[in-house]
Every structure is written in C-alpha cells, then in structure tokens.
Amino acid sequence: YKKLGHSRDMALRVYTTRLLGRNSELVLHGGGNTSVKTTVKDLDGKNYDVLCVKGSGWDMAEIEPEGLPAVKLNPLLALKNKKKLSDEEMVAYQKRNLINIKSPNPSVETFLHAFLPFKFVDSTHSDAIMSVTNRPNGITFCKKIFGKKVSIIPYVMPGYGLAQKIKEVYLKNPNINCLILLNHGIFTFSNDAKESYDLMIKYVSDA
C-alpha cells in the first residue's frame, strides 16, 4: 500500500478490517464498521486530521483503501455538543466534509466513530454477542459475562442519537475498552490496531 501512496495507518486498518470481515461468526450479512483516525494531504497541500470510516456498499472482507472514505475530523467533533441532527442533515454534513467528494457515503455510524477518542474503532454484529444481548434479561447476562471494562447500552437506532449516547457513556466510564449495544452488536477500540482487533476476538469468545 505504501507504493500506492497509502499510510501505515491505512494499511493496518484495511488488514484488520478484512480479518474481521472474513470471519462469518463476526459479521452477519456483511454488517459491521471499522475506522481509523489519521492525517491526509489534500490537493491544497495542507494536512488534515481525518476519520477514515467504512463506506456504504463495501464488504469488510474485501475492503480496499477506497472503501474507507476520509472525512475531515474537526468538523465532526465541532458538533459534539449538538443535541439533535436529522438523518438528512447528518448525511449531508458528512458528505460535505469528505476529502474526496467522489468517495462512497460514509457509514451511518461515522459520528459514533469520531466521538470515541481512539485511533482504531471496530464494530461487528457477532452472532455470539447477539445471542446474549437478545435475551429478555440481556443486560444482566452481559454484566456477568464481560466485566467492568465493558459498558452495556440499551438499543438506540444507529445515527446521530446513538453517537451522542455512546459519547455520554464513555465520558462516565473512560476506562472501558468495549461497548455492547443490545440487539445490535459490539464496539472495541484502542490506539493500537492489533489491540482493538484482539479485544473484539476476546469479548466475542467470552460470549
């Protein structure tokens, strides 16, 4: 990837995304998202902090750098304290801040990935996790199984509202390294690509 002008950050992100995507027990029906926070140089010669997050239409198992569109990070973070944002406003804002406007639409979970203050964020719809969370007493089971490093969140529809909820949960529990959203899936995060991937495997195995 270096020969093609891509950074080590991007190479690691592509590699671990493929690892997750090729595990059918982790990614149901192609679902899941990954991201990396890094810097890129635009045509104006300036370096921008960006969030490269999986774009719509891309399969994690076969992801390429082009499937992780770069969105300017600071404009995303500028909305951190905004209470509400409609789906239409959210999509338009994300597209407006793409480095390359021809890139695929960024994930509906873009703000969620931006608000978690870690370089690498992984999200999957693991069937093992779902088998625990989808029970009537899912929260109780999750707390027993996963311990204090994991926060359990009742289901919120993916979008800006979920991003705000996860931001609030993380601020109250800054020592966590995993979030489980009932009836949806699991998020792991770290400043190290391997650690974020390993955490995903660990918690799914625990389930």
Language model: regions and residue ranges:
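Glycine-rich flexible loops
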Residues: 1-207
